[in-house]
Amino acid sequence: MAVLLVLTGNAIAGSLLDLCLSRAYARQHFTWKYTVSPNNADNPDTLRRVAPAAERNRGPILDVLSRVLPKAGVVLEIASGTGQHAVHFAAALPTVTWQPSDPDAASRASIDAWRKHASLANLNAPIALDVRSAPWPVPDSLAAIVCINMIHIAPWEAAEALFQGAGERLTNDGVLFLYGPYKRDGAHTAPSNEAFDHQLRVTNPAWGVRNMEDVVQLGRAANLWMEEPVPMPANNFCLIFRRTGI
């Protein structure tokens, strides 16, 4: 069976502590600020976190995923964050089995609360998984990898590890799908992205909006060739790579 590996949110930023701190800071100060479902403390729904950015971007992202991803297989989602993407994508793609994951226990609790709330037959309970801990505890043959809003809020080494893992795990013609803001030819595509990049680098000099051309070079080194950059709302892009040369 084909397997789809999906990374959303933040991959590992050096260590689990770095990851938790970077995710918490980004959600507090940038677009990932989330709220908790307003229920009483005894209700497991209180664990369901809501990130406004995930609510806004899930529809446009799904439109592209529906077009480029294989139609069947197991979807392993890494760094699932709140779990909103997992629920939305699993509901819209019922022919795949969605396997969310996150290295952060609180995030896994939110994902599981969303899973129980949605009660989808094709959405599994979240697992603990650190993307920078090799070898990845996933099957060797992956049909696709999807990474949403990660490489700009993590050190460059996280992007390198992502492409290395993708090159090792994707089957021939497998897809690597990235979503987020990018510079083109070293220039920001909008003033808001430039301001966001400045905020990121003040917070952590290892973070920042990446040059699309540098990301493309990582792909080439892993036999992953970009087919198309898809412009998205709010000055983001989807980058679609395909595995060749197996």
Features from the language model and the residues they span:
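A short acidic, Gly/Pro-enriched loop at the edge of an enzyme's catalytic core
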Residues: 136-145
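Class I SAM-dependent methyltransferase Rossmann-like catalytic core
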Residues: 37-70
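Conserved class I S-adenosyl-L-methionine
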Residues: 72-81
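Short alpha-helix
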Residues: 206-223
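Conserved Class I S-adenosyl-L-methionine
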Residues: 189-210
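Conserved beta-strand signature within the Rossmann-like core of class I S-adenosyl-L-methionine
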Residues: 173-182
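A short, conserved alpha-helix within the catalytic core of class I
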Residues: 153-166
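Class I SAM-dependent methyltransferase SAM/SAH-binding core
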Residues: 87-134
